[in-house]
Amino acid sequence: MHAQCSGTSGEPVSPPLIAITCGEPAGIGPELCLRLPERFGAKAPFRLLVLGDRGLLAERARHLGLAVTLRDWTPENPFPSLLADTLDVLHFPLTAPAMPGRLDPANAHHVLNLLGRAVNGCMSGEFAAMVT
């Protein structure tokens, strides 16, 4: 089922796409992102897109025992529906392996790249908003 909102003309429009950056890979951001589907799922009036390292998210999901499906997202293939157990991810590879609670300066560029992509997406209208 395609989630839609009504525009001012009454015609259906796609719900807004919100970009969420995972933040520092050694921090709590990846875990918070993984909890988004259970919190919002199919009932949200918006679509969520997580910007981060897919492998890191998969590893943290396994560690937490979360049954979350990570789905690759591209601008050319946006997903029209919201699913309660699925997280759409725009993959940005880590610069260095991440250990929870241990910051690695080598991943600073990774974090800046996430923020830059989210800002550019908002400026171009691709994303309706960003959360960091």
Regions of interest found by a model, annotated:
Residues H2-T132:
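Contiguous, glycine/small-aliphatic-enriched amphipathic segments in soluble metabolic enzymes
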